[in-house]
Curated annotation (Swiss-Prot):
Name of one Pfam family that matches: PEPCK_ATP
An individual GO BP term: gluconeogenesis
EC number: 4.1.1.49
Keywords, ordered alphabetically: ATP-binding, Cytoplasm, Decarboxylase, Gluconeogenesis, Lyase, Manganese, Metal-binding, Nucleotide-binding
PANTHER family noted in UniProt: PHOSPHOENOLPYRUVATE CARBOXYKINASE (ATP), PHOSPHOENOLPYRUVATE CARBOXYKINASE ATP
Needed cofactors: Mn(2+)
Reactions performed catalytically: oxaloacetate + ATP = phosphoenolpyruvate + ADP + CO2
Residues noted as binding Mn(2+) in the record, renumbered to the chain: K186, H205, D242
The name this protein goes by in its record: Phosphoenolpyruvate carboxykinase (ATP)
Species assigned in the record: Coxiella burnetii (strain CbuG_Q212)
Amino acid sequence: MEQIAARVTYINLSPDELIQHAVKNGEGVLSSTGALAVTTGKRTGRSPKDRFIVKDEQTADQVAWGNINQPVEQRTFDQLWERALRYLSERAVYISHLQVGADDNYFLPLKVVTEFAWHNLFACDLFIRPSGDHANGKPSWVILSAPGLKTDPERDGVNSDGAVMINLSQRRVLLVGMPYAGEIKKAMFSVLNYLLPPHDVLPMHCAANAGQSGDVALFFGLSGTGKTTLSADPHRFLIGDDEHGWSATSVFNFEGGCYAKCIDLSQEREPMIWNAIRHGAIMENVVLDENGVPDYADARLTQNSRAAYPREYIPLRVENNRGRPPDAVLFLTCDLDGVLPPVALLTKEQAAYYFLSGYTALVGSTEVGSVKGVTSTFSTCFGAPFFPRPPTVYAELLMKRIEATGCQVYLVNTGWTGGAYGKGGERFSIPTTRAIVNAVLSGKLKEGPTEVLSGFNLTIPKSALGVDDHLLNPRKTWEDVSAYDVRAQRLIQKFRENFEKFKVPAAIREAGPSDVH
């Protein structure tokens, strides 16, 4: 394993010790909740333009290179890695031995080396703490995080003063000039998303929970569309809130913690998340008042304020961090146009179509430099920034899993209805969406009467327990039906234009929307 030279090395400190170091180092302060509060300067979200993957013989033909998966030469990586090692050699560093993947067959051992104590705490909160020597002879991946080291675009061959570089062949992840902790977890997510498909495991940007009888539900969606909120269900057991694998025999969490958005967090609406923000947790870019009390409504630092906490802080959880193959799969889409239904039942071909499309919204975007407010987007696999291989690799695996299990896939709109965003529409309330989810998970939704929504050709229920019937057909929620048709046709055209880039069987392409009539 790679040796790290440093002025002082702290290895496998406890969360309490890491918190003490972070406060002593001036990295953060303790809030009234007991959680460690930190700020990350100008980088309050991910920096997709600064993420690179080393292009070599192993990866050249396997990665979908482009604006998302930007190639970097091995030599460029090596030079920056050495610069980071020299930088860290003059400082105190924190090292923890962790793992990603809660499945004995597919986990990866990790050696996390950080300049900041709080980044190491973040890794301990979000990754899995192994019991004993659990590496089983597997070689460790090394994460090197040096947020205080700035890059020079001309000298270092990068785009700004920071970079994330993933070296899939050498099992190394390098983060320099990146104080935002989300980069650490998403880098390893990208690694697993590359490594697992050849092993017949579908990696997924989704939350997962289980019912009393062990039935499993998956919630796919971009940040801010409801994954964490809806999976933290007071009547179900959490597996995880963000990253999972689906093998032939199980669903398993990649992580050992949660990373919840905090903007406008309320104890009433999201009690499980609220109660998890305590000693041992981290609040990232949450504004505190003079008494250290968090103001979750204050977005002056960012809309993307966050809390990181271990899974153990959620009382209702699946202890072994995994479950059986899913009984229900929910694609959470946040529709700004207000033309999609609150819920629709998808065929497996429609599931592949909407999975590849990934239509949703960027809500309080997690990316640096994004426009404030809400914008619609198509994000392949409901997580385009994290999937290195061609999208059809993941879509084919999804269809294979659906065919093998017979699980029902649903499209759930957590966005607007009765009109478009900012033009008279209203967002579905969390209680309404929870009622939809409850109807899905009860199994009764797919047994009741349905109708087909024109244009989108989606099968929608005529009734759902706890939901007003008139909300189920979006066309009926608009006062001006012709205005609905115009808006729906506009979105259908966007779907078609976006889907042109995919080379897929005709059955999948034809499962998409047609003209409104």
